[in-house]
């Protein structure tokens, strides 16, 4: 019998970073927004920083294992990363891993785009409910960015993960972002649907004002 996985409507949020109400600490904005909408308890997230945020003196593989591979898949201090990557269901994530070839290389020896990509892959690999990314399009070629976007869409629709983005160039994300997040001077958030993805006959309002959870 085939195991049919339930697909979810993607949730990919782009923060309007052009607004001065959003600070330089984008991670703080992401977390505050989630708390603002009523999320209780700990927030299970992975974060790809504007700068790569990697362990420079470790290899690509060691970075993946340290933060992304579950400890149950690491046996006797020897990683099982090849087995893990081969069994990934996200084909686009597999493609991104393949682009970080020669994973025994040290991060400090990588080119700028490679370092950025390793940080993005590590974030997607992590088993988290939320994916936070600060400028994931920065230093990334159009070809690679297309694969990153496909990987994020897959994670959101197949694995029910919510993706939050602050883009270096927001226009590069208009084809996959489902919602815009804005913030007024009082700190109130507004969530708006990306009308480019809305159905033409949809007559419902595209703007939802979010009140702070009590």
Language-model segments: what does each one mean?
Residues 175-176, 183-214:
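Conserved beta-strand-loop-alpha-helix hinge in the C-terminal portion
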Residues 10, 41, 127, 141-173:
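Conserved catalytic loops of ABC-family nucleotide-binding domains
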Residues 131-136:
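Catalytic Walker B motif of ABC-type/P-loop ATPase nucleotide-binding domains
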Residues 71-92:
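Short coil-to-helix "N-cap" segments within the ABC nucleotide-binding domain's helical subdomain
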Residues 86-112:
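Conserved ABC nucleotide-binding domain
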Residues 119-120:
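Hydrophobic anchor residue at the start of the ABC signature
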Residues 6-75:
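ABC ATPase nucleotide-binding domain signature region
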